[in-house]
Amino acid sequence: TNTNINTNMKVIKRSGSIEEVSFDKIIKRLRSLCEVEPKLDIDATDIAQQVISEICDGIKTTELDEEAAKKCAYMVTIDPAYGELASRIIISNNQKSTSNSFSETVTQLYNNTDIHGKSVPLVSEGLYKIVMDHKHKLNDVIDYSRDFGFDYFAYKTLERAYLIKINGKIAETIQH
């Protein structure tokens, strides 16, 4: 069954669609990340309950992931496996929120515009041309599972200081 927290509580999905907040979906997401090898022996229900206790109507699914990862990071002193889950949540969130194509990401960065529609590329024309000339090779060489080699704090450092943003939203993955 689909347990909804409150029929008035809505969540905004990455696609922009709106649906009721579902405790079951939050648990399912956390459990699926725990099942990745090496499997983590963590109570996903406990984390989901902590996340649910702090949500508000209109929260974004990306924010649910951020909150869950933060809760896990705080619990790393209880069990190091929580640190691994925090990493999996935050990196999965990044991958779901960005393009899975390096060349597409470079195109977005190159075609960036300011609020007036003026072209303001975030990568050079030279880089853009090289990537476009070799996009199939470059796209094929990236193994996104390698992103999960970074821990939560390493990812948060990259997010804060290094990953390029478009309109305040991270536009690239760790390997882009």
Q: Model-derived features: where do they sit?
A:
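Extended catalytic cores of very large enzyme megasubunits
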Residues: N2-H176
